[in-house]
């Protein structure tokens, strides 16, 4: 009887440690910072908050001060030239590229741009490719049978 009690205690303790470890692992490796901004802006622009958070995770690892080799800035890694286009579309006055380091604005701009791309492309792979490589580059890929079977979706990303 005593052995069964010890086994049960051990199993409960083991289960607790496993659950705690998994939770800690995900919180460390997949932090959900800026949750309110992500949910609010994803909702405004018709995006899935998890989709937006995953882009932020891949693009900047939730670092609001990230700058890529190509000059993309902030959480969602937006190029200043793209940001100027977005600022105009959103009616943001006196935009300057340093504003891209402001998490709330960067998430708003990124969600706006995703909505813009969603109107132009029909599937997630093509939308994400356009977000990363640029709309013009993706249009070139779509014309190439090596990358697209139908001219509207990518079968592979170069």
Predicted feature descriptions by range:
Residues 126-158:
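Catalytic and substrate-binding regions of cell-wall glycan-acting enzymes that process beta-1,4-linked
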Residues 14-64, 105:
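Export/targeting segments at the very N-terminus of extracytoplasmic proteins
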Residues 70-93, 109-110:
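Substrate-binding/active-site groove segments that recognize
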Residues 51-54, 95, 121-130:
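Surface-exposed patches in mature extracellular/periplasmic domains of secreted proteins
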Residues 58-61, 80-88, 133-136:
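Glycine-rich, acidic and aromatic/proline-enriched surface loops and short helix-turn segments
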Residues 24-28, 38-41, 64-73, 93-103, ...:
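Second-shell loop/turn segments in exported
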Residues 1-17:
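N-terminal Sec-pathway targeting helices
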């Amino acid at each position: 009887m005593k052995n069964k009690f010890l086994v049960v205690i051990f199993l409960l303790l083991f289960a607790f440690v496993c659950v705690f470890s998994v939770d800690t692992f995900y919180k460390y490796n997949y932090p959900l910072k800026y949750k309110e901004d992500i949910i609010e802006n994803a909702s405004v622009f018709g995006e899935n908050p998890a989709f937006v958070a995953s882009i932020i995770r891949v693009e900047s690892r939730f670092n609001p001060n990230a700058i890529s080799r190509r000059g993309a800035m902030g959480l969602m890694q937006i190029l200043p030239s793209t940001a100027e286009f977005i600022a105009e579309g959103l009616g943001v006055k006196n935009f300057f590229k340093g504003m891209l380091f402001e998490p709330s604005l960067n998430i708003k701009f990124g969600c706006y741009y995703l909505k813009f791309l969603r109107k132009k492309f029909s599937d997630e792979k093509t939308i994400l490719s356009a977000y990363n490589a640029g709309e013009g580059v993706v249009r070139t890929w779509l014309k190439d049978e090596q990358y697209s079977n139908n001219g509207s979706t990518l079968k592979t990303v170069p």
